[in-house]
Amino acid sequence: IQGDGPYILVGWSLGGALAYACAIGLEREGADVRFVGLIDMVRPGEEVPQTQEETRARWDRYALFAQRTFNVEVPPIPYEELEGLDDAGQVTFILDAIKDSGVDIPGGIIEHQRTSYLDNRLLETAEIQPYDGHVTLYMADRYHDDAIFFEPRYAIRQPDGGWGEFVDDLEVVPIGGEHIQAIDEPYIAKVGAHMSEAISQIAAENEENAAK
């Protein structure tokens, strides 16, 4: 626990959204937030409608993905039953149906699909609040193909990653590669180099303030 700070908050993907939310909460409590880093926490190129039609289209895409990836014929999707469930209930329902079809899919893969789906849904439905501090977006070139298949709106990236309307002091640092590569070499080295410089500056400012 840092007390009043200074705080350095960084996260990749959904972790970036959590870092951003923590920064807002800490600043509201009067804490000193010095650095907020979003590692390829890039919003869809346009808003994802939260409608019945969009829910059905999303699960149609998921069924195609399962057929292609696991070589399994997904049973007809019971849309009416799904629409009465939340996101966690929906993905559990579908994955249970796939398991019950008799296809042998390792439990780890099933759990990965569940958590990945829920993470993406959290990103799509998050209510972003404005932030008046400095934010650094480490931005890859694109999302990976599976993410775009699930949600085609991720194929388009705004130059500001969709953050400009919420953050006045936004710095975009291009790192190259795809979303899932952002925390691997050589891309993470670009993040590390930029962050090291920023942290060194924060440390120097702290020493200067302590000497006064």
What label would you give each PLM region?
Residues 1-212:
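A hydrolase-biased, glycine/serine/histidine/acidic-enriched motif that marks catalytic-domain neighborhoods
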